[in-house]
A protein has these predicted regions:
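Bacterial N-terminal signal peptides
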Residues: 10-20
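Hydrophobic alpha-helical segments within soluble ligand-binding/sensing domains
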Residues: 73, 129-154, 168, 197-199, ...
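Flexible loop/hinge segments that line or gate small-molecule binding clefts
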Residues: 95-136, 144-153, 247-255, 260
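Extracytoplasmic "Venus flytrap"
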Residues: 30-53, 57, 62-79, 83-85, ...
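Short, solvent-exposed amphipathic alpha-helices that sit
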Residues: 42-57, 137-141, 164-183, 197, ...
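Flexible loop/turn connectors
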Residues: 236-238, 242-302
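Hydrophobic alpha-helical
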Residues: 90-107, 173, 187, 191-253
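Hinge/cleft segment of the Venus flytrap/periplasmic-binding protein
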Residues: 28, 157, 161, 176-177, ...
């Protein structure tokens, strides 16, 4: 009887140890908040890839959507902090909302890493910033046209003007295009990132300039509209098109030979890299307050099979976890 009691006590102690260790392990699991600006596909693909990567790294992740509302974004940041998250990965809505997010995170002692929206005042208060080099992103597209079109008229279909990104893309593209003095930009129209407006813009451009030989379209959603317009008019074979983003439908256009080149800035691999950097900051392995260029990739038919896809598989994301992290760089001049 005494032996049975000893055995029972031993089992109870063992169970308590297991429960204690289990609780300790659970407490040690890091939790990250991913706050996206909207629920649009770009941000959905980014958060999906980050969630898959987090799971493979043994990290818990909670996803918030701010719906382009600064007040909602701040509420998301505050809710994440109240949950006791270890870090925040965020696509901010605006500069003012970034400031509010940084203030709240700093007050709570929670590292916060921004994807886009760099501002020099906020860099030392953050875990880091990551975004693309806007001018540098578009420049190789102009260079490709300069090398692959001997001469002729070029058109540019821009995104929404006034925010600075569309203007920077145009500037970078023109720098690359300038390598061939026989190419002349004869039309530059804003289609506000909208497929239908791009369709209408391309129709008007080709009507006014039926001998156009090249078009730079600043994102692939607009490129779909441009391709549809040129197909309807029977001019698609005449016009070489370059674009940006690397979205699934953009890669489809490349596969079909309707888009010659795109420069991709996949939200998937960018979010995975940003997550890894943030985790490094949290663990004390990476110094906070640095700026990083987001991963980009020029994609044509020749390398389509190795493109960093927005809708990457779990196997692809697992391979990204083995890649070297982006190195910190000197931040771009503030606008």
């Amino acid at each position: 009887m005494r032996k049975r009691n000893v055995w029972s006590v031993g089992v109870m102690v063992l169970c308590m140890v297991v429960l204690f260790l289990g609780g300790a392990f659970a407490e040690d699991q890091l939790e990250i908040a991913f706050i996206r600006a909207t629920g649009e596909p770009y941000y959905q693909y980014g958060s999906r890839a980050a969630e898959i990567a987090a799971k493979k790294l043994g990290v818990k992740m909670i996803v918030y959507t701010s719906n382009l509302d600064p007040a909602q974004e701040l509420a998301n940041v505050q809710d994440a902090i109240s949950r006791g998250v270890d870090g925040i990965l965020i696509y901010a809505v605006s500069l003012s909302s970034e400031r509010a997010a940084v203030d709240a995170a700093n007050k709570a002692g929670v590292p916060i890493f921004f994807q886009y929206g760099y501002h020099p005042d906020l860099l030392p208060k953050s875990a880091g910033f990551m975004q693309i080099d806007l001018k540098g992103f578009a420049r190789p597209l102009g260079e490709w046209m300069a090398e692959n079109i001997p001469s002729g008229k070029i058109a540019i279909i821009e995104g929404t003007l006034g925010r600075g990104d569309a203007e920077a893309y145009t500037e970078g593209f023109l720098e690359g295009l300038a390598k061939n003095p026989n190419l002349q930009v004869v039309a530059k129209v804003s289609a506000e990132w909208n497929r239908q407006k791009a369709y209408e813009a391309a129709t008007n451009i080709i009507t006014a300039h039926p001998d156009i030989v090249g078009m730079f379209v600043q994102n692939e959603d607009m490129a779909v509209g441009v391709v549809n317009a040129l197909e309807r008019i029977g001019k698609l074979e005449q016009v070489k098109i370059v674009s940006q983003n690397g979205a699934p439908y953009g890669l489809d256009l490349i596969r079909e030979g309707k888009l010659q080149l795109t420069n991709a800035n996949p939200p998937s691999i960018a979010s995975v890299m940003a997550l890894r950097i943030l985790l490094g900051v949290i663990k004390g392995e990476i110094e906070p307050g640095h700026f990083y260029w987001a991963p980009t990739q020029l994609i044509s038919k020749e390398n389509l099979n190795v493109a960093y896809r927005w809708d990457a598989s779990e196997e692809e994301i697992e391979e990204w976890l083995k890649l070297p992290l982006p190195e910190p760089v000197i931040p771009p001049p503030s606008s």
